[in-house]
Amino acid sequence: MTNISLDKLVTESRNENTKNIDRVETLEMLKMINDEDKKVAEAVEKELIHIAKAVDKIGEAFFNGGRLIYVGAGTSGRLGVLDASECPPTYGVSYDLVRGIIAGGQSAMFKAREGAEDSKKLCIKDLKNINFGKNDILVGIAASGRTPYVIGGLEYANGIGATTISVTCNPESEMSKIANISIAPVVGPEVITGSTRMKAGTAQKMVLNMLSTGAMVKTGKVYGNLMVDLKATNEKLVERAKRIVMQATGSKREQVEKILKETNFDVKLSIFMIESSLDKIKAKEILDKNKGYIVEAIKEIS
């Protein structure tokens, strides 16, 4: 356990603006919460340089066969699992490429297991169980920046030569000193003292959105602002796939449906086939050569 006392942590300090939140009308209470929430995006903005460095490292790792692994406890762990779980349906990647690990295991997603966060060894064990290696990226998430479970993971990852990133909401935390890249949006005291699921959790979610989205953009999973590697696994996504191809190419629905059927709903390939007027085999060959970047593939045939 780190020797940083809780009373020195910004996330544990008392918010002067909400001291009477229990004595006001409902609307005023919600205005207090909303006013505090407005500070979150500004805090994240101040960390954009560090977030950009992290995104570049993650994209580089993906190209080298590495993965993005989130570790955290409680709310922080759940946010990592949430972000990771959205990547496969959105970007068509494997469930192994971006993974979230929460202290205490799967059951901790639904029922708090607070004691699990106090063990450094537990995180090391969890990382070994997924064969975490030096080509992978470890993102440690903890509002306080002092959670032993996460610190143990960062120390282990550093020890094997992997890139480490910390996402905290306290300046100069122990985690920020351990990680190769520190991202620390300081959102100030919480509306309810110490309830870091609120502003700190929102800030962490915003940062994780940027990390995963940025890395996917950097690795060709997005064309314009369209998710061209999504998997059409249900009716909503089938319809979205059609709309994406129509928006990207300006083609009529009938043509798009025909091409998507031919490519087995490979959105990216369908777009490039229409844009290039190439058959499926040749279009796939050029796309693969350009690592899935539609823009680069179009340049090659221009």
UniProtKB/Swiss-Prot annotation:
Q: Pfam families annotated for this entry? A: GKRP_SIS_N (PF22645)
Coiled coil (UniProt feature): none
- Which GO annotations describe the biological process of this protein? amino sugar catabolic process; N-acetylmuramic acid catabolic process; peptidoglycan turnover
InterPro entries recorded: Etherase_MurQ, Glucokinase_regulatory_CS, MURQ/GCKR, SIS_dom, SIS_dom_sf
| Active site residues of this protein | 86 (proton donor), 117
Enzyme Commission no: 4.2.1.126
Per UniProt, residues of the SIS domain are 58-221
Which key words tag this protein in UniProt? Carbohydrate metabolism, Lyase
**Which GO terms label this protein's molecular function in UniProt?**
carbohydrate derivative binding; carbon-oxygen lyase activity; ether hydrolase activity
| Record's catalysed reaction(s) | N-acetyl-D-muramate 6-phosphate + H2O = N-acetyl-D-glucosamine 6-phosphate + (R)-lactate
Question: What top-tier enzyme class does this entry carry?
Answer: lyase
* Tagged with keyword Signal: no
What is the name listed in the Swiss-Prot or TrEMBL entry for this protein? N-acetylmuramic acid 6-phosphate etherase
What organism is the protein native to? Clostridium botulinum (strain 657 / Type Ba4)
